[in-house]
Amino acid sequence: MYPLIRRYLRRIDLFMLLLCAACSVLSVVVLMSIGQTQLGSNNKASVQLIASLLGMMLAAVFSTADYHALARAWPLHGVVAWGLVLPTLFLHNVNTGLLTIGYDAGGTSNYSWYRVGGMTFQPAELAKISFILTLALHLSRVRGQVNRPRNLLLVLLHILLPVAAIHIQGDDGTALVFLGIGFIMLYAGGLSHWLAAGGLAAGIVGGAALLALRPGLLKGYQFKRILAVLTPDDPALADITYQQNKGAMAIGTGGLTGQGLFSGEHIFVPNAWNDFIFAYLANVLGFVGAAAVLVLLLALCLRTLQTGLRCPDALGCNICVGIFAALFLQCVINLGMNLQVLPVIGVTLPFFSAGGSSVVMMYLCIGIVLSVGMNTRRSKLDMQRII
């Protein structure tokens, strides 16, 4: 038993695990502080703690799995993940007693949730993992030939169909993350620089032109959230800008060391436990605490990318690039929301924002990255023995 544990600890990336554990511990402490002052948040810390512990155990299990087998098992996890997503495209707030399908958690026509009793679950988080695994497998099979028209068309369909499904749910923030993950993985998988630049430019210009010609494509609250970033002091948008203005104020008044955890002297930020936990954290822990969080998340992103670059095969590299993209994009979008440079689109801060399903799924992603790292080390040891 003990020799197995020692061998496991020698092979596992302890630095990555420590980074994740540090994020989780800080998240639970901050949520406990929020729970003292905001109604409806008193159980967030305990749920986060349980989800983090469960996630760590699942990460340990997945780290011992062969990531090749996980990717090849796409008929299993793909059917489960998208089988949970698809009903929410058509069933909205359908209550079957204990279960509510297509639950609109925030009252913004985002029907991407299931509600079971008093708990909610977002299947798009599980679909995100399946999406990364299947796209990584697809790209590894067309390695060196991704720019051929037929291959490129099939990869684009692989990316855009899931994005469309998440958009139909009403969760445009997650759809944007899916799109970003797909583009980064495609570019890292060999898409030519000219096609990447042209596609990105065409997407931005085409999207802007489409919205200008048909503004009705945006829901009313979405259009107002964009205007709120451009004109945050507009009295007509006070109900939309209130949370972001409070968040920016909280960050600006945190000072060097902040107002202090559990002090009750922080700037009030509505629903601080969710999308705006960074603003609350910057207010109570100041610049020092905010910088520490950014360093932890940046180190985690870079470690994930480093693991992929060290992997000798395309599949492992593609998987790590996809998980890096998910982490990085969520961090950038969430920080942009908190700093009032991006509209509020419901993207949470990985490992910090309250949410049991998102925390568990993020740990599953880390477990897969650890699997890539462990298999890479095993391959190097086997090669050394052969030599």
For the regions a protein language model found, what residue spans apply to each?
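Membrane-helix boundary/helix-loop-helix interface segments in multi-pass membrane proteins
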Residues: 1-18, 23, 29-169, 325, ...
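Helix-loop-helix junctions and helix-breaking kinks within/between transmembrane helices
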Residues: 34, 124, 153-186, 213-216, ...
